[in-house]
């Protein structure tokens, strides 16, 4: 492990919950930002089909 000596400074009983908690908070913030700044993501989570904005002409 490259950063194995961190546990000589921070106890694993403190460091691991902080690490996992910070990852959880960041994931929640990213999901909130995507949900609040897009219109399609909440529809996707609710199971609605995406609307086709424009048709593609071949040829």
Swiss-Prot record:
Which residues lie toward the Cytoplasmic compartment? 1-11
A single GO molecular-function term is: electron transporter, transferring electrons within the cyclic electron transport pathway of photosynthesis activity
How does this chain sit within the bilayer? Single-pass type II membrane protein
Q: Which Gene3D superfamilies match?
A: Light-harvesting complex (4.10.220.20)
Q: Which residues bind a bacteriochlorophyll?
A: 31
Q: Which residues lie on this side of the membrane: Periplasmic?
A: 36-59
Keywords per UniProt: Antenna complex, Bacteriochlorophyll, Cell inner membrane, Cell membrane, Chlorophyll, Chromophore, Light-harvesting polypeptide, Magnesium, Membrane, Metal-binding, Transmembrane, Transmembrane helix
Q: What family classification does the UniProt entry report for this protein?
A: Belongs to the antenna complex alpha subunit family.
Q: What does this protein do?
A: Antenna complexes are light-harvesting systems, which transfer the excitation energy to the reaction centers.
Quote the subunit structure annotation. Answer: The core complex is formed by different alpha and beta chains, binding bacteriochlorophyll molecules, and arranged most probably in tetrameric structures disposed around the reaction center. The non-pigmented gamma chains may constitute additional components.
Q: What is this protein called?
A: Light-harvesting protein B-800-850 alpha chain E
Which gene is this protein's source? pucAE
